[in-house]
């Protein structure tokens, strides 16, 4: 059976592993998921990620990040644009997550960008997810 929304599956697996205080989570690999993981790493929400060749396909292994007393670095993840209802934003109307404390991940013609990077470059696109 094919997966309807692989990005929502990626975010749900991260959310569940984070809630259970797992150190890492293994996911099916895709370029889009690797790019989202790169944004999460650059913004400080995860410590690292790597790609491994599995018996069937590739796997993306994400190492979650916690504070000194095991407080979570990811407080929340939310899928915004879904297969049944796509959400787009112009460069002049980009969303701000928690007044700038969180990050919106936006798929643009320049690749995946955060809301701040997209505003700086003056591009809009599909709002994939919010992370805070």
From Swiss-Prot:
InterPro entries: Ribosomal_uS8 (IPR000630), Ribosomal_uS8_CS (IPR047863), Ribosomal_uS8_sf (IPR035987). Pfam families: Ribosomal_S8. One of its GO terms (cellular component) is ribosome. Keywords: Ribonucleoprotein, Ribosomal protein, RNA-binding, rRNA-binding. One of its GO terms (biological process) is translation. GO terms for molecular function: rRNA binding; structural constituent of ribosome. The keyword NADP does not apply. It comes from the Bacteria. Belongs to the universal ribosomal protein uS8 family. Part of the 30S ribosomal subunit. Contacts proteins S5 and S12. HAMAP family: Ribosomal_uS8_B. PANTHER family: 40S RIBOSOMAL PROTEIN S15A. One of the primary rRNA binding proteins, it binds directly to 16S rRNA central domain where it helps coordinate assembly of the platform of the 30S subunit. This is Small ribosomal subunit protein uS8.
């Amino acid at each position: 059976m094919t997966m309807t929304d692989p990005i929502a599956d990626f975010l749900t697996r991260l959310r569940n592993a984070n809630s259970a205080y797992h150190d890492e989570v293994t996911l099916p690999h895709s370029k889009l998921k690797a790019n989202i993981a790169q944004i999460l790493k650059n913004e400080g929400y995860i410590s690292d990620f790597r790609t491994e060749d599995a018996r069937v396909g590739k796997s993306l292994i994400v190492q979650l990040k916690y504070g000194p007393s095991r407080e979570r670095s990811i407080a929340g993840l939310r899928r915004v644009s879904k297969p049944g209802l796509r959400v787009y934003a112009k460069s002049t109307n980009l969303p701000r997550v928690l007044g700038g404390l969180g990050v919106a991940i936006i798929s643009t013609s320049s690749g995946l960008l955060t809301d701040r990077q997209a505003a700086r470059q003056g591009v809009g696109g599909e709002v994939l997810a919010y992370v805070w």
